[in-house]
Amino acid sequence: MSEIFDAKAFLKTVTSQPGVYRMYDAGGTVIYVGKAKDLKKRLSSYFRSNLASRKTEALVAQIQHIDVTVTHTETEALLLEHNYIKLYQPRYNVLLRDDKSYPFIFLSGDTHPRLAMHRGAKHAKGEYFGPFPNGYAVRETLALLQKIFPIRQCENSVYRNRSRPCLQYQIGRCLGPCVAGLVSEEEYAQQVEYVRLFLSGKDDQVLTQLIARMEKASQDLAFEEAARIRDQIQAVRRVTERQFVSNAGDDLDVIGVAFDAGMACVHVLFIRQGKVLGSRSYFPKVPGGTELGEVVETFVGQFYLQGSQMRTLPGEILLDFNLSDKTLLADSLSELAGRRIHVQTKPRGDRARYLKLARTNAATALITKLSQQSTITQRLTALAAVLKLPAIKRMECFDISHTMGEQTVASCVVFDANGPLRAEYRRYNIAGITPGDDYAAMNQVLRRRYGKAIEESKIPDVILIDGGKGQLAQAKAVFAELDVPWDKHRPLLLGVAKGADRKAGLETLFFEPEGEGFSLPPDSPALHVIQHIRDESHDHAIGGHRKKRAKVKNTSTLETIEGVGPKRRQMLLKYMGGLQGLRNASVEEIAKVPGISQGLAEKIFWSLKH
């Protein structure tokens, strides 16, 4: 117990009402957040002679100060607890690492509705279907829908400025509502209704309506129309046959848990209208000595209560673990949703199968994660030994990419003890240097990255510079001049020069710009982690450079035409659906673009042709 913190005096001031407490260490950092139905009773339990676990002992030993917030109800306390956990990220709480919002499929409320992926608050008028486990699942579904039900997926800015149909219409993946006369209002509305029913899980209704339309078309001797509808029916059937569907139109989340070697995996299975939309595995940060029950309870609370504004709550949540606050959680979620949410822990029938599936996926994902963790831990330990460091908790690597000195982009990738930390990857557009001067580019990106105060936890132990002696010299010069509050002896700078023929395994490493470097054996775990972070940095830089180059390519041709400034370039590209559409347009079509005269249209036409 802390010698500074007077627990007896503090407990005399604590009420027996429900509320939330925050525990602080000597540095004023929140180290734990908790809730209680009875604050006095709960806080008193921390200062008994026999504590429940080593984790609690370690926590209490660091307490310098406790803040208490009284609430009217337990539900308020539960919501406030998870808001505080998200705000402070206390090291003794179980923390949900990934709290980004889930993507939905959005069907807009426009005259001619469009389909799109949506994340975030649901302000736009229209319908939202989901949630889906990730953006990939949404994009796959949108691509599938485009083949079966060809309604538009273009932005409104493109749709409103079309004068003729785009490529999607030509290949049969859009009905072309942007151009009058290509599709009737009734036909487009019918396809939109099919999409609505399909995304709502009402496949049978879609098939029934399509079959009726096909039969009518056959009776009317409209055989081409009947054949088109037949193909649509077959496509819908192929999709529905591949889906795992329950007998009832279940709308639920299924949560399976696995726990081993101090690491937990929580696998969430998303089921809407009886169909498995997908799933995602989470690996919450678990303080040492934490019981599995606390992991599950905290995860479920954070998962639903912290992200409630961005997440559609299902009617039912299935768990394979009993929660002490199950009723409180269900009541809190019901209050947020404005309808009854059920939390079940002992399902039967199909629900038991779902739970077994989630549990199996959690165990499989945990085995994979532990294997990866073991590999990256071994590699970082080996590299620390090579570099004579006690440990490596964070590494950053830089690379430069350009084409003949144009569109230069620098990348910074970050590894921590668990491997790539992709949320902290960054790209930097480099400007104001001589084209092709990689040294100046490296100098600029390092100053932008490190020429300011950095949180202690984000100061890297090692910085890898891809490029050998010259680039390392730039890095050394930058760090010698930087006026930053942290120690100039940290981080360690390491240059990496590619081997002969740029073959992996032949890299030369440099601690200093002068003198000879050294190499590691091709089978060295230390070399493997260097190659991994170097390749990540290289790929990240190239990806950014290609995006920048593609953007410039779309406008560079127009930039040479007198009278076509940035606003007109943007209008031309939007109205024509891109540079290729503009190249294929006639003078008359170009002249219809707002702000383009007949004379300027002719100039643009001939400039693009020649």
From Swiss-Prot:
InterPro entries: GIY-YIG_endonuc, GIY-YIG_endonuc_sf, GIY-YIG_UvrC_Cho, Hlx-hairpin-Hlx_DNA-bd_motif, RuvA_2-like, UVR_dom, UVR_dom_sf, UvrABC_protein_C. GO terms for molecular function: DNA binding; excinuclease ABC activity. One of its GO terms (biological process) is nucleotide-excision repair. Residues 204-239 form the UVR domain. Residues 16-94 form the GIY-YIG domain. GO terms for cellular component: cytoplasm; excinuclease repair complex. It comes from the Bacteria. The keyword DNA repair applies. It holds the Pfam family UVR. Belongs to the UvrC family. Interacts with UvrB in an incision complex. HAMAP family: UvrC. This is UvrABC system protein C. The lineage of its organism: Bacteria, Pseudomonadati, Pseudomonadota, Gammaproteobacteria, Enterobacterales.
